[in-house]
């Protein structure tokens, strides 16, 4: 029987599939951070349980850490308690921890892949909604709740219902300057923020195959923003080249065996999907969101939509509400929208490729007057590589702030927040009301678009001189 990539990985991980019950699947890798793990560890303590396989759990500090200082003194009392609790729990239960002083510390969805913790064909979970990032490697990766975190710790399994399958094919090749972020925003714009609900999405097509692993991670990272359970991309030579030699990747004979096994991790030619979506890559322009969800997105050369032109009353009301919150007028050309904050970072766009793309637009220029722009590498390894390439100097000379790794301004949980009324060009993944701070306005863009906005003081079409 022909199978999709998702079905192959799913079937290989079923432990028990009793009739009339949700199957129990095995979990290969469990990633944890300081925010969603304390209650889970506490639950184990109360029940007197040990972890089933502590060597398969990896922990880092990222959500509530400071990006200006590696000192605990720089943290709020709540954040300090969270990181200290994680440190204590990891020590007690024997979990490998990348704390704020570790050279490999970083955002969990950046750190995991770059260390080779993320591998094709595995099931990966984390108490974080953007766990789908790891699907870029052909893994089945999805976010779980805190009670499920405890369950995985105790049993290394989860009870899960099988999802429907969706194929999203991006045919042909994108124009120069069009990035993975533009591709995934265009996809979300086409199917909407709930178009993938109930599905595991497989991204494919020439435009997807041409992406680097960094780009593929950006695409899968935002699968959740279209409502999908997970996003996956079949592993190939690009995947193997990225993983080869990384700390937790297979070595020696095991590597050759892994390569052979990974070659089978692709949807069969005659496999059927429950839904199929097709985009033409050549139609994709630089994208940016105008409203309060990732599906409210347009191309840079387009206008803020007019709710009066929308025939669906529910959609019309949503547009009106979003326009009121973001304080934009219908019909405004997006290149006329000014910004006063820029955030380059997050688990969506804080890898070395992202920083290189942003640096191209920062080099030899200056951040516009009245604009504050920060660059936050996704991990210690990304920061180290960027500094070896001199990217930090490019940003600093242009007036950007160069920070320590962490989730930072993606969410209003740490000290990196926007003020009410701020308008931010952000490379993150969510532009919900208050996501970056109460009353803040977020426009999701690629790293190149964010850096260009920083120096121009407004959004620009990076395909043209500015």
UniProtKB/Swiss-Prot annotation:
Cofactor (UniProt): [4Fe-4S] cluster
Keyword Glycosyltransferase: no
Keyword Iron annotated: yes
Cofactor: how and how many bound: Binds 1 [4Fe-4S] cluster per subunit.
PROSITE patterns recorded: ACONITASE_1, ACONITASE_2
UniProt-listed InterPro entries: 3-IsopropMal_deHydase_lsu (IPR004430), Acnase/IPM_dHydase_lsu_aba_1/3 (IPR015931), Acoase/IPM_deHydtase_lsu_aba (IPR001030), Aconitase_4Fe-4S_BS (IPR018136), Aconitase_4Fe-4S_dom (IPR036008), IPM_dehydratase_rel_enz (IPR050067), IPMI_cat (IPR033941)
Major enzyme class: lyase
Pathway in which the depicted protein is active: Amino-acid biosynthesis; L-leucine biosynthesis; L-leucine from 3-methyl-2-oxobutanoate: step 2/4
Keywords: 4Fe-4S, Amino-acid biosynthesis, Branched-chain amino acid biosynthesis, Iron, Iron-sulfur, Leucine biosynthesis, Lyase, Metal-binding
Stored CDD domains: IPMI
Disulphide-bonded residues: none
Gene3D superfamilies: Aconitase, domain 3
EC number: 4.2.1.33
GO biological process entries: L-leucine biosynthetic process
Matches recorded under SUPFAM superfamilies: Aconitase iron-sulfur domain
Catalytic reaction(s) noted: (2R,3S)-3-isopropylmalate = (2S)-2-isopropylmalate
Molecular function terms from GO: 3-isopropylmalate dehydratase activity; 4 iron, 4 sulfur cluster binding; metal ion binding
Binding locations of [4Fe-4S] cluster: 347, 407, 410
Functional summary from the UniProt entry: Catalyzes the isomerization between 2-isopropylmalate and 3-isopropylmalate, via the formation of 2-isopropylmaleate.
PANTHER family per UniProt: 3-ISOPROPYLMALATE DEHYDRATASE (PTHR43822:SF9), HOMOACONITASE, MITOCHONDRIAL-RELATED (PTHR43822)
Family: Belongs to the aconitase/IPM isomerase family. LeuC type 1 subfamily.
Quaternary data: Heterodimer of LeuC and LeuD.
Name of the protein in its database record: 3-isopropylmalate dehydratase large subunit
Organism of provenance: Shewanella piezotolerans (strain WP3 / JCM 13877)
Primary gene name: leuC
């Amino acid at each position: 029987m022909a199978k999709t990539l998702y079905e192959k990985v799913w079937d290989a991980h079923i432990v028990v599939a009793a009739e009339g019950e949700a199957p129990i699947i095995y979990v290969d890798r469990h990633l944890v951070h300081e925010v969603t793990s304390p209650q889970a560890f506490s639950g184990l303590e109360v029940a007197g349980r040990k972890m089933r396989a502590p060597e398969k759990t990896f922990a880092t500090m990222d959500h509530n850490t400071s990006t200006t200082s590696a000192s605990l003194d720089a943290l709020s009392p709540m954040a300090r308690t969270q990181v200290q609790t994680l440190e204590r729990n990891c020590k007690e239960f024997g979990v490998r921890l990348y704390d704020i002083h570790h050279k490999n510390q970083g955002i969990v969805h950046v750190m995991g892949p770059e260390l080779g913790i993320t591998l094709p064909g595995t099931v990966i979970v984390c108490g974080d909604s953007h766990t789908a990032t790891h699907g870029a490697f052909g893994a089945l990766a999805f976010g779980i709740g805190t009670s499920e975190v405890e369950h995985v710790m105790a049993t290394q399994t989860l009870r899960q219902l099988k999802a429907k399958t969706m194929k999203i094919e991006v045919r042909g090749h994108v124009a120069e300057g069009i990035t993975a972020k533009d591709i995934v925003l265009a996809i979300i714009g086409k199917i909407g923020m709930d178009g993938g609900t109930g599905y595991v999405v497989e991204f494919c097509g020439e435009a997807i195959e041409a992406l680097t692993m960094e780009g593929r991670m950006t695409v899968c990272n935002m699968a959740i923003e279209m409502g999908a359970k997970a996003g996956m991309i079949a592993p190939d030579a690009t995947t193997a080249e990225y993983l080869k030699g990384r700390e937790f990747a297979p070595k020696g004979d095991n590597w050759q065996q892994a390569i052979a096994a990974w070659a089978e991790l692709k949807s069969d030619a005659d496999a059927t999907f429950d839904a199929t979506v097709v985009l033409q890559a050549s139609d994709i322009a630089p994208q940016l969101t105008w409203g309060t969800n990732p599906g409210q997105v347009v191309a840079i050369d387009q206008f803020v939509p007019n709710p009066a032109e929308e025939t669906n009353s529910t959609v019309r009301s949503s547009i009106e509400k979003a326009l009121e919150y973001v304080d934009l007028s219908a019909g405004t050309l997006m290149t006329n929208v000014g910004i006063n904050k820029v955030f380059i970072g997050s688990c969506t766009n804080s890898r070395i490729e992202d920083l290189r793309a942003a640096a191209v637009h920062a080099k030899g220029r200056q951040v516009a007057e009245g604009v504050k722009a920060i660059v936050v590498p996704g991990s210690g390894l990304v920061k180290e590589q960027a500094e070896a390439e001199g990217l930090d100097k490019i940003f600093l000379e242009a007036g950007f702030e160069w920070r320590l790794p962490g989730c930072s301004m993606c969410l209003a949980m740490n000290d990196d927040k926007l003020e009410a009324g701020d308008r931010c060009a952000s490379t993150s993944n969510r532009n919900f009301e208050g996501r970056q701070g109460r009353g803040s306005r977020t426009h999701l863009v690629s790293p190149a678009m964010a850096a260009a906005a920083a120096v121009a003081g407004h959004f620009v079409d990076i395909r043209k001189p500015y």
